[in-house]
A protein has these predicted regions:
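A conserved acidic beta->alpha catalytic loop
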Residues: 36-45, 59
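Catalytic-site signature of metal-activated, phosphate-bearing donor transferases
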Residues: 65-71, 82, 89-213, 217
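Acidic helix N-cap motif at the loop->helix transition within catalytic regions
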Residues: 16-19, 41-50, 91
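Short beta-strand/loop segment that forms part of the nucleotide-sugar
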Residues: 30-38, 55, 84
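Short aromatic/hydrophobic "clamp" motif used to bind/position activated sugar donors
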Residues: 79
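Alpha-helical repeat scaffolds
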Residues: 219-224, 254-265, 290-297, 333-342, ...
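Short, well-formed alpha-helical segments that are part of the catalytic scaffolds
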Residues: 6-28
Length: 637
């Protein structure tokens, strides 16, 4: 009987990873075809342990040639192309089989979950055309990152398969071992000479440049790919626009970014990443109402059949997380908790969401109640998760909650347990005593940082901290703070000071503040911001008062406005908001404050804001409301 699906794989010198891949799907697949392109290690021997269908192919420098050769030996009704550095998930594969038994598109996009970086700690999700009908009408094209097309080079109708493929080939150690990027670039440079106008080739070069960290060249190549696309349905065309946006975001070129996003939204209205990216930019620029509108539209949509291309959480987890963040900023704690809870339900491994929920609960509940909530919702699913949460709770000074978390962990390495105990004791103002091994393991587990070490050394100079710090990349911090060494960066100085303020270490904070004189006077504004952040408003005001008005930070102006509004000193709050507009004309928040405070001139204030932000939907609504009110008032006279 003809198999439903043939697994096709091309290999060369993959002995170090091939067995793991084949073992992941041998038991539940019907036919495995392996094509070897010239291995000199044990690749073929390992392949023959799993299948009888192992074939040799003389390498032509073109991956598509090898994939198409493999397809000729496949007898299945459908082909699923897999690489040696990938594994299959059984449950989703069975869902794929069910889908393929019914009428469906000839090409199917698979979900590729890639583990990248050191030890695969970072994951990215992408879609690639990997499943296709084995009827001779479809083939691969392209020397690398092959693309499925009709045999006569026409685009073929494409659907979305439920299958998940886990890709390990871009973990740092595997990339280094295989030299993938260098190999790929050599092949692509050869192909681009023969086909300069191929958008797909430029897209692949962009991918390799991006992976190598050459962001400037990557942006050029993705831009070429986007311009040269000849069919908007190609996944690489959509991904080109996505990567252009990503790279422009990294360079903070927001206007250009919004332009490409708007263009992409028109071309691909069913790709949710583009409105999500627009909302994220609006959030960064404090246009919260417009951002909220987009996030809610992604969640509430019942019209558009969204098809994510990279971020599978673009229509659920991410909008919920961002709405939680915005409502928290607006002090709408009920809505914030609602959205963080929904975000956690979508992705229970996001530490940021968990900690935001913990911080929210700490405003209204006792530590035991918070910990009971954490237990009910399985926050501490592993020792690693518990330690990550501990790192956050101890930095924020939550001593009792941190103790409850420690008590729930049963398999913590003793030096790490010692480090956590000292962190908690520090919050309780207990004299710090810690071994060097506990310091080392605490740093390794990211429980201890330079700010902790400096604080402990200040409180107990007999600890082995000098040696640890001087033999690390934070030796300059120790030298500056304790040995009158060269000035460290402002960022590092404020990082150490913030910990002292967060933990209420007044005497130590005073010691650090005495060192600020080596910096420009504007440092006082940043120090004021820190005191304000941790609710030491009176101390913050003292620092703001010794800073020139032009040196107050944007956050400083916002802090002062909030303080004055809470104190009902509206005239002065309005004056500072106007000064904020003069100094930071592109910051939406200052315009919004003038609209809220200056009710007598509201229409004029809205018009001034719209001159700077002509596309802001919230301002347009406000102006309409004011116009309706004025028309009604005129008619009633």
């Amino acid at each position: 009987m003809r198999p439903l699906i043939s697994i096709c794989m091309i290999v060369k010198n993959e002995a170090h990873i091939l067995r793991q891949s084949l073992a992941s799907f041998r038991k539940f697949t019907e036919e495995i075809i392996i094509v070897d392109t010239g291995s000199t290690d044990e690749t073929k021997e390992i392949a023959k342990e799993f299948t009888d269908f192992v074939y040799d192919f003389e390498w032509t420098g073109n991956f598509s040639d090898a994939r198409n050769f493999a397809a000729k030996h496949a007898t299945g009704k459908w082909i699923l192309a897999i690489d040696a550095d990938e594994c299959l998930e059984e449950e989703s594969y069975l869902q794929l089989k069910k889908q393929l038994k019914a009428p469906t598109e000839p090409i199917q996009m698979a979900q590729i979950i890639s583990f990248t970086g050191e030890k695969g700690r970072v994951t990215t999700t992408n879609q690639m055309a990997r499943v296709y009908k084995n009827d001779g009408t479809i083939c691969f094209r392209g020397v690398i990152h092959e693309q499925l097309e009709g045999i006569d080079k026409h685009a073929v109708e494409t659907g979305f398969a439920p299958v998940k493929i886990y890709h390990y080939g871009y973990m740092s150690e595997i990339v280094e071992k295989q030299g993938k990027s260098d190999r790929n670039l050599r092949l692509l440079e050869k192909e681009v000479k023969n086909n300069k106008n191929s958008g797909f080739v430029h897209f692949n070069i962009g991918q390799e440049m991006n992976r190598l960290g050459d962001k400037k060249e990557a942006l050029k190549e993705f831009s070429k790919a986007f311009r040269l696309r000849d069919n908007n349905q190609y996944i690489w065309a959509k991904l080109s626009a996505y990567h252009i946006s990503e790279l422009l975001e990294q360079e903070k070129r927001y206007e250009e970014n919004l332009a490409i996003i708007e263009e992409a939204k028109v071309i691909w209205p069913n790709v949710p990443e583009f409105p999500l990216k627009k909302a994220n930019i609006l959030y960064l620029h404090h246009q919260l109402e417009d951002a909220k509108e987009i996030y809610h539209s992604l969640l509430d949509n019942k019209v558009i059949d969204y098809q994510p291309i990279v971020l599978y959480e673009a229509t659920n987890f991410m909008p919920h997380k961002m709405l939680g963040t915005i409502y928290l900023e607006e002090k709408d704690y009920t809505r914030a908790m609602t959205h963080f809870s929904k975000a956690y339900a979508e992705n229970s491994s996001d530490y940021g969401v968990m900690f935001q929920m913990i911080m929210l609960l700490s405003k209204f509940h006792q530590p035991k109640e918070i910990f009971a909530f954490m237990e009910r919702h399985n926050f501490i699913s592993s020792t690693e998760t518990g330690l990550r949460l501990l790192s956050m709770t101890t930095q924020q000074g939550y001593a009792e909650l941190s103790e409850l978390i420690v008590q729930s962990l049963t398999d913590v390495y003793p030096p790490v347990a010692e480090a956590t105990e000292v962190k908690i004791a520090t919050i309780r103002n207990v004299f710090p005593v810690i071994s060097e091994s506990a310091i080392v393991f605490g740093i390794k587990e990211e429980l201890i940082d330079a700010a902790d070490l400096c604080l402990w050394h200040y409180e107990n100079p007999q600890l082995p901290i000098e040696r640890v710090m001087k033999n690390s990349d934070v030796g300059d911090i120790y030298n500056f703070i304790f040995e009158n060494g060269p000035r460290i960066s402002k960022k590092r100085y404020l990082f150490v000071l913030e910990r002292a303020i967060a933990l209420g270490k007044g005497e130590y904070a005073d010691y650090l503040l005495a060192l600020r004189n080596v910096y420009h006077d504007s440092i006082n504004s940043h120090i004021a911001d820190l005191f304000f952040q941790y609710d030491f408003a009176d101390i913050a005001l003292d620092f703001y008062n010794i800073v020139d008005a032009d040196e107050v930070t944007k956050e400083g102006y916002i802090n002062l406005i909030n303080y004055l509004v809470d104190a009902d000193v509206m005239d002065e709050a309005l004056s500072i908001a106007e000064r904020g507009i003069d100094n930071f004309s592109t910051d939406f928040r200052f315009y919004l404050w003038t609209i809220k405070i200056d009710t007598e001139n509201r229409a004029n204030r809205i018009s001034e804001a719209m001159d700077e932000f002509p596309n802001n939907r919230y301002l347009a609504k406000l102006l309409d409301e004011v116009s309706v009110f004025q028309d009604t008032a005129t008619n009633n006279r």
